[in-house]
UniProtKB/Swiss-Prot annotation:
GO terms for biological process: nucleotide metabolic process. The keyword Lipid biosynthesis does not apply. The lineage of its organism: Bacteria, Bacillati, Actinomycetota, Actinomycetes, Mycobacteriales. Its cofactor is a divalent metal cation. Its EC number is 3.6.1.9. This is Nucleoside triphosphate pyrophosphatase.
Length: 198
């Protein structure tokens, strides 16, 4: 039995590898914008959980005997959900808006096993530094934050501009190991069954 990651996120892959798991990687093809449009009026946590569930469900049929993990993260800042900025200009704009503020990074998880499914969100509070304009522009031009929820990374260059987090650090990076552990336990699996040395 394998863990299958329904994501192309290098951060999610890195979390699992650092935790002793070498997952199969099978990015799901989900129209995130269309799904979000269909969820108008739902809570931010519901939206992020629905994205994670859609990703896991998109590939679960191809891996009926494995554990499929879908994940999605978005930043809740000033009452608005923000996903990936995708461009340098949008990244600069976002950072000028979020610097010096505190926001919530919401990560949705859907873990599908042969024994059932577990859907859960994890919310971590992030306080952004008062980064100056030159550093914001330089950071955006590295390309690192363009494909990251909230336009930042905690575990790389973006770590310079995060003053504090309250909550699960792995969730901020893209996948909460405590949530995945709870999902595996609920399905009757031990985490150690999926470590590389077993």
């Amino acid at each position: 039995m394998n863990i299958v990651l329904a994501s192309s996120s290098p951060s999610r892959l890195s979390i699992l590898r650092s935790a002793g798991v070498e997952p199969l990687v099978c990015p799901a093809d989900v129209d995130e914008d269309a799904l979000l449009d269909s969820l108008v009026g739902r809570s931010p946590a519901d939206k992020v959980a629905a994205l994670a569930q859609a990703k896991a469900e998109a590939i679960a049929g191809d891996y009926p005997d494995d554990v499929v993990i879908g994940g999605d993260s978005m930043l809740l800042l000033d009452g608005a959900l923000q996903g990936k900025p995708h461009t340098v200009d949008k990244t600069i704009e976002r950072w000028k808006q979020q610097r010096g503020k505190t926001a919530e990074l919401i990560t949705g998880h859907c873990v599908i096993t042969p024994r059932g499914r577990h859907v859960e969100t994890s919310t971590t509070t992030v306080t952004f530094a008062h980064a100056d304009d030159a550093d914001i522009e330089a950071y955006a031009r590295t390309g690192e934050p363009l494909q990251c929820a909230g336009a930042f990374t905690l575990e790389a260059i973006g770590g310079w501009f995060i003053d504090s987090i309250t909550g699960d650090p792995s969730s901020v990076i893209g996948l909460s190991l405590p949530v995945v552990r709870r999902a595996l336990y609920a399905a009757g699996y031990n985490v150690s069954e999926f470590w590389n040395n077993n």
